[in-house]
Amino acid sequence: MKRLVLILAITAAAVAVPFAATAAGNEAQKMAMKPVVYTQAVVDLRNAMRMLWEEHIVYTRTFIISALAGLDDTSKVAERLLRNQDDIGNAIKPYYGDAAGTALAGLLRTHILIAADIVSAAKSGDNDGVANGEKKWSANAEDLATFLSSANSNWPKSSLRDMLDIHLAYTTTEVVSRLGKNWAADMEAYDKGHAHMLMFADMLSDGIVKQFPAKFTK
């Protein structure tokens, strides 16, 4: 009975305003089909930010592989990975100033150095070392989230912290999986972590565009 009443009500409404409903429906359809248009400045920022964070995830991956296998290129990979943190810091200087960029690079360098300690401890079977490193990693993630959220209200601290924690979890899974020679789990963690890092890059780009719209009109 309720279903019948509902059908009758919908039918009555449709008969009463056929032309208005059709017009509204057509307009809604047009809006739904309207593509999102970015200015060139926005595209450039998103591409640059994605490149930087892709390097972050790729060179982190390369370091994990080299360090666990004891390859000769480990120190060189570490140098390149640390340089990426400086590049990310430099990328925000046009918006937040030199001091902020340098501070971000410092926090990210700490993030990488802690990761290196965790990899080393895991490789040697030092469970206490791994646990201690994970505590430091978590504290560093808190510092990063606090720093970034204080610079831009479009980067909520809770969202940043969640994104960073997920990044740490995927990276940890890579290390554990490689040590256990669970190659499928290792690759799955990397693939998901890679996609996640690009989402993080877009989150940062979107926040910058919202905070400084005048810089992205063309």
Question: Which ranges hold each PLM region?
Answer:
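Bacterial N-terminal signal peptides that target proteins for export
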Residues: M1-L8
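C-terminal amphipathic alpha-helix
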Residues: K34, A41-R46, R50-A67, L81, ...
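Juxtamembrane helix-loop boundaries in multi-pass membrane proteins
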Residues: K76-R80
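Helix-loop segments that flank and shape redox-cofactor active sites
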Residues: V36-Y38, F63-T74, G89-A100
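Short, cysteine-centered beta-strand-loop-beta hairpins and adjacent loop/turn segments enriched
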Residues: A121-K123
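Cleaved targeting-peptide boundary
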Residues: T22-M33
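C-terminal segment of classical bacterial N-terminal signal peptides
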Residues: A14-T22
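Mid-chain, structured segments of secreted extracytoplasmic proteins
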Residues: L82-V119
